[in-house]
């Protein structure tokens, strides 16, 4: 029976190699990723078979576990292809495979019995008897339904011998754990086949059939409204409750999010979990953690269903995106002498710009760009997107640290 109140695993998304490196750099204990087929995030980049092998080697070398998503609901014509794919998974040897379809669970149990099976949140697990049922089918972990309260999760943990996993940060679906047909209806993209176009995030208005050119906002608000637009989940203020509930793994949503978002969120929850594990008696949420999460690209935050607050669960009726105005500059590729760094530039930067650098530990540090040059060390006044540049900073940093420009007039970016 698993320990109920041990330090939980921090599980982060890894939609491609760059995101994998960032998740590892900022402290994830495990990552979830996918191949090119049979995943619910076909637009996140994902990995070819050979890339999966490399990704697993990279993660395992850093003592980070890898969970491979195979969480679509499959059709008859895919069964032979699924068998071939599962045989490949067996050779790749991820730490677990994430599945929702009982038919794929059956195949995986037969073809790759040496690989742990984690049940996807798409399976809508909401009570301890359901967990017991899945355990009899060789499931080793259940990603619980997002619709559960913290007290309900505690009851499940106390009445089962299964590892549990729960989302703690990121986008939430307006439908029951992703069972939605809006995307199918409006764009002919199947949300349960990895092709969701997120129409719940679109801006809608009411049109009266005899006045086709008159658009009326659903709420009396000059900005209109987002009829289905869920707030984002954020549980940074409730790490003690999550840990004390005995949840085995705390999961961050976002395989399609950029590395600026990923670095910020993984770092923040890593720091919070470690702080609570080190001294639960004097633990307190740091304002710098809240600040970090509030300055990345996000919708209004809430605690979802964890505390049963209907207002918290309500749609986001304001702007779809919030966050501090800053520009993501790029990431450090390597050190280039004392306090000089080769940087992959994502947004324009000028010499003497004020920037902040996010490292895995401690708060973000500010610095001026004290010198700027091309990779062949030719001095320049600015560096353009999709180039590399050598920049001089006032402090010591490391490869994969994230750089952001302060007080930019550009909107928050996340790529």
Regions found by a protein language model. Give the residues of each.
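Alpha-helix C-terminal capping segments
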Residues: 24-27, 107-111
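Gly/Gly-Pro- and Ser/Thr-rich, intrinsically disordered tail segments characteristic of DNA damage-repair
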Residues: 80, 114-115, 119-128
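Aromatic- and glycine-enriched glycan-recognition loops and surfaces
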Residues: 44-53
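Alpha-helix capping/helix-boundary segments
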Residues: 103-104
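Surface-exposed amphipathic alpha-helical tracts and adjacent flexible/coil segments at the periphery
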Residues: 1-26, 30-40, 55-56, 62-72, ...
């Amino acid at each position: 029976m698993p320990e109920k109140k041990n330090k939980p695993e921090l599980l982060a998304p890894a939609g491609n190699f760059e995101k994998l490196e960032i998740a590892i750099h900022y402290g994830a204990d495990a990552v979830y990723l996918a191949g090119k087929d049979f995943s619910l995030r076909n637009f996140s980049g994902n990995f070819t078979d050979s890339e999966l092998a490399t990704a697993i080697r990279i993660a395992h070398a850093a003592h980070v576990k890898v969970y491979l998503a195979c969480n679509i609901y499959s059709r008859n014509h895919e069964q032979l292809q699924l068998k071939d794919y599962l045989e490949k998974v067996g050779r790749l040897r991820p730490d677990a495979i994430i599945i929702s379809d009982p038919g794929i669970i059956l195949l995986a149990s037969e073809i790759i019995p040496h690989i742990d099976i984690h049940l996807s949140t798409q399976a809508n697990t909401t009570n301890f008897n359901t967990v017991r049922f899945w355990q009899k089918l060789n499931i080793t972990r259940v990603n619980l339904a997002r619709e559960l309260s913290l007290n309900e999760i505690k009851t499940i943990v106390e009445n089962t011998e299964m590892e549990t996993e729960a989302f703690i940060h990121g986008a939430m679906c307006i439908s029951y754990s992703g069972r939605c047909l809006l995307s199918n209806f409006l764009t002919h993209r199947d949300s349960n086949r990895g092709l969701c176009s997120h129409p719940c995030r679109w801006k809608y208005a009411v049109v009266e059939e005899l006045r086709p050119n008159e658009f009326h906002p659903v709420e009396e608000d000059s900005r209109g409204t987002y009829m289905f637009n869920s707030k984002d989940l954020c549980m940074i203020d409730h790490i003690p409750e999550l840990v004390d509930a005995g949840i085995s793994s705390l999961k961050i949503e976002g395989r399609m999010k950029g590395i600026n978002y990923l670095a910020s969120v993984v770092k923040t929850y890593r720091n919070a979990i470690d702080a609570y594990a080190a001294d639960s008696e004097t633990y307190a949420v740091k304002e710098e953690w809240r600040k970090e999460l509030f300055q990345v690209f996000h919708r209004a935050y809430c605690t979802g269903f964890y505390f049963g607050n209907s207002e918290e669960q309500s749609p986001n009726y304001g702007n779809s995106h919030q966050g501090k105005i800053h520009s993501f500059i790029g990431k450090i590729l390597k050190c280039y002498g004392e306090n000089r760094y080769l940087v992959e530039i994502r947004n324009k930067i000028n010499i003497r710009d004020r920037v902040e650098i996010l490292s895995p530990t401690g708060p973000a540090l500010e610095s001026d760009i004290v010198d700027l040059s091309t990779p062949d060390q030719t001095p320049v006044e600015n560096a353009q997107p999709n180039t590399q540049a050598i920049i001089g900073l006032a402090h010591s940093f490391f490869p994969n640290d994230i750089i952001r420009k302060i007080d930019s007039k550009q909107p928050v970016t996340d790529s």
